[in-house]
Structures are given as structure tokens and as C-alpha cells.
Amino acid sequence: FPADWDKASVSTPDISYRFTRKEDTDTYHITQRFQTPLHPVLQINARKEKIRSVKVNDVPATWQSIESAHGYPLLSIQAEGTSSTTITIEWEGAPLHTLAAQEPVIASNGKLALQIPSGASISQVYDPQSVLAKHTMGATAFNAQIKGEPGHHTFFVYTHQGEMDWWQPVNIYIENTRKAPSYTDFADIRPEKCRMVDFDRQLNASVTDI
């Protein structure tokens, strides 16, 4: 569901799923209609840097962070196989930071500088499109020299904030700095250098003679 929704539901003949949000508390209701209920696993995007508590059917439960998560931290919560399951998550701490809220426009061989927000840190870089000629990571800034063809590109930085870890995408646009070919404007033609050319002979000739 979209991140800004505070309630939603979906239902099929076999299962119903309902979600509600009130301030820092998210509640998920799962109803199964199988003869033998399955063990549901809830995977959700984190929306804050810490979790105050997780409960499954009012019983404290554990959660796991999925290491390969990208875009947002992804959490996994497993429940017992019952016909009705209620999972409650209480969040706390600061909202998750974004390194680049907008897509920077950079020339090839240009430089990219990103400020790392207070409370966050980065430890790794994954560059599948090879757009980073070189880069440095510090406690407060990420700097890189950009290379590559014009267009939209993405690389990823492994971000840590509070209890959350995830691969955060950084989108950049490499602008086209190549000069367009020059053309002579018709107004620049010098009439005294022009001469008449008779095409009648060619236009009226046989196709094999042209």
C-alpha cells in the first residue's frame, strides 16, 4: 500500500488483510480461511529508525531485518498458523533520512557531493552501472567523480540509521555536454558566389542515365 495511507484492506476467498495506522502504531489483521492455517510472514517497509515493540496476538514477538532490502529497510515478522492473526508494531525515533531527495544533474567527469544527515551513516557502495569514477565516504559527506553516458543512472549506498540498515538508491542524471554539429544558416550564403545549374537534362533523362 502507499506509504501515506493510514488504512487499507484487501480480501480474497482464502485470506483477508487489513491495515490501520494511528500515530506511531501500525496494526495488521490477517484472517485465513484455509482448512489448515498457514504460518504468515509479514514483510513491511520501516518508517522510523527504531521499533519500540512488536506483538503478535498481544504477545511480544521478535522481528528480523532483511539485509538485501533496497529503497527502504524491510522487516520480517513471523506468526503462528492460526485462523486470525493481529500484528501490532510501535515505532519510535526519527524518520528515515534520504541522501538525495531530488535527482542531481551532473556533467560526465563532474563531481557529486552528498551530505550525510546526522544520525545516519554509510558503509558500502554498489555501482552496477559503473558511473562512479572514484568516490570517498566520510562521517558527514559522500563525494564522487561521475563518469558515463548521458541519461538517468542509479547507484546504491548501504545506509545505517538507528536499528535500520538498507541499500539506499541514489539517482543521478548525466547531462549531455557534447556540442551539436554546426550548420550554415541560409542567410550566410553569399549570392555573388552562386551560379545557375541547369537540371533539365537530368530531370528529363532516362532513369538509367541519371
What is the role of each PLM region?
Residues 1-135:
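Non-catalytic C-terminal accessory modules of carbohydrate-active enzymes
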Residues 85-91, 150-170:
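Short, aromatic- and glycine-rich surface loops/edge beta-strands on solvent-exposed regions
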Residues 140, 154-158, 174, 180-210:
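Alpha-helical solenoid repeat scaffolds
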Residues 95-117, 168-195:
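Low-complexity, Pro/Ser/Thr- and charge-rich linker/hinge segments at domain boundaries
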Residues 79-83, 145-152:
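Surface-exposed, short loops/turns at beta-strand junctions within beta-sandwich domains
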Residues 129-148, 204-207:
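Immunoglobulin-like IPT/TIG beta-sandwich domains and homologous Ig-like subdomains
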Residues 32, 44, 110-118, 124, ...:
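Aromatic/hydrophobic beta-strand junction motif of beta-rich domains
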